[in-house]
């Protein structure tokens, strides 16, 4: 229903317009206060790069963060990552991740980023506190913040926005009548726009999510997902249909698709009940972070990597490297 409202297919969005105007007034007022200096942002002693979006829902932001961190690491840059830690609840903040940190504490995306990149990762509702926690323990040259475009309390040097190239901005209205956190005109003031799928417009960086081999949660075995049989697909991400379409594009034959809420907590009995004997469960890598501790041998996940094309990604990386050095 939400997808139909935000796309404009359902006329119910009109009933939510008063709330959207209120949301837009408040969010616009907050940004204006920081631009005018009425409120002051905290500036870190190292460059800060924000990777965020203008819309609610999955846009492929986390794969971009992982790509960015890995690319900088390969070029000898020491990177730290901060996040709000949505879906997690720590005993105290800021929380600096360790190999023992669970997604229940830090949120699934920060744990995934930590496992994939090995970079220092810290979470806190106040992102400046997360930055300070990293700087107190690690000699990093640059900070990448996963989400937080609208978190103006943290000053930033570079802003990168990720857009779903198929859905883009839906009906164009602020939350809750539409998917927008800020107006589309906000793109004029950011440093880079990355478009996940669809057709990129002039000046935008095209991106695709490239799937890898499916990985068994228990054994670590890797196989092409098309070799797995009787697949039940599970996705607890911002836009589950994208994951299901990716599986089908890889040649997987899906018996059932189970969309879950983004950041939804997962328990063994609930996940086990999704499959019967002879079926194979395939989930996103983000869901695997939450299931690894109680997985069964017929549970697999499909990792995806961001693939950016054109000359703009190299120019963006060079800009970040020059800032970091």
UniProtKB/Swiss-Prot annotation:
Gene Ontology CC terms, in alphabetical order: plasma membrane
GO molecular function terms listed in the Swiss-Prot or TrEMBL record: ATP binding; tetraacyldisaccharide 4'-kinase activity
Biological process, per Gene Ontology: lipid A biosynthetic process; lipopolysaccharide core region biosynthetic process
Enzyme class: transferase
Pfam families recorded: LpxK (PF02606)
Keyword annotations of the record: ATP-binding, Kinase, Lipid A biosynthesis, Lipid biosynthesis, Lipid metabolism, Nucleotide-binding, Transferase
Highest rank taxon of the organism: Bacteria
Record's function text: Transfers the gamma-phosphate of ATP to the 4'-position of a tetraacyldisaccharide 1-phosphate intermediate (termed DS-1-P) to form tetraacyldisaccharide 1,4'-bis-phosphate (lipid IVA).
Name of the protein: Tetraacyldisaccharide 4'-kinase
Coiled coil: none
Family: Belongs to the LpxK family.
Binding site for ATP: 55-62
Reaction catalysed by this enzyme: a lipid A disaccharide + ATP = a lipid IVA + ADP + H(+)
Pathway stated in the Swiss-Prot or TrEMBL entry: Glycolipid biosynthesis; lipid IV(A) biosynthesis; lipid IV(A) from (3R)-3-hydroxytetradecanoyl-[acyl-carrier-protein] and UDP-N-acetyl-alpha-D-glucosamine: step 6/6
Alphabetized SUPFAM superfamilies for the sequence: P-loop containing nucleoside triphosphate hydrolases
InterPro entries: LpxK, P-loop_NTPase
EC number, UniProt record: 2.7.1.130
Keyword Nucleotide-binding (UniProt): yes
């Amino acid at each position: 229903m939400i997808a139909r409202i935000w796309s404009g297919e359902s006329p119910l969005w009109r009933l939510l317009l008063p709330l959207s105007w209120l949301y837009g007034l408040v969010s616009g007022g907050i940004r204006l206060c920081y631009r005018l200096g009425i409120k002051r942002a905290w500036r870190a002693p190292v460059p800060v790069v924000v990777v965020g979006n203008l819309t609610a829902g999955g846009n492929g932001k986390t794969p971009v963060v992982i790509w960015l961190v890995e690319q900088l690491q390969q070029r000898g840059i020491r990177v730290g990552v901060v996040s709000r830690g949505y879906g997690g609840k720590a005993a105290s903040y800021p929380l600096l991740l360790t190999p023992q940190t669970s997604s229940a504490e830090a949120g699934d995306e920060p744990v995934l980023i930590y496992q994939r990149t090995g970079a220092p990762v810290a979470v806190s509702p106040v992102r400046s506190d997360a930055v300070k926690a990293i700087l107190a323990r690690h000699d990093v040259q640059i900070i990448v913040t996963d989400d937080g475009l609208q978190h103006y309390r943290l000053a930033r040097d570079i802003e990168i926005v990720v857009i779903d190239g198929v859905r883009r901005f839906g009906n164009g209205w602020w939350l809750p009548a539409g998917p927008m956190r800020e107006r589309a005109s906000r793109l004029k003031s950011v440093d880079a726009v990355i478009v996940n799928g669809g057709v990129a417009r002039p000046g935008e960086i095209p991106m695709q999510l490239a799937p890898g081999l499916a990985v068994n949660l228990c054994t670590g075995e890797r196989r092409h997902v098309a070799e797995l049989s009787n697949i039940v697909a599970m996705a607890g991400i911002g836009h589950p249909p994208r994951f299901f379409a990716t599986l089908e594009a890889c040649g997987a034959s899906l018996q059932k698709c189970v969309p879950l809420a983004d950041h939804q907590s997962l328990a063994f009995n609930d996940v086990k009940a999704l499959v019967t004997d002879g079926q194979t469960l395939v989930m996103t890598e983000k869901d695997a972070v939450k299931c690894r501790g109680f997985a069964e041998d017929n549970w697999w996940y499909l990792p995806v990597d961001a693939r950016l094309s054109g000359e703009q990604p190299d120019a963006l990386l060079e800009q970040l490297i020059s800032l970091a050095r």
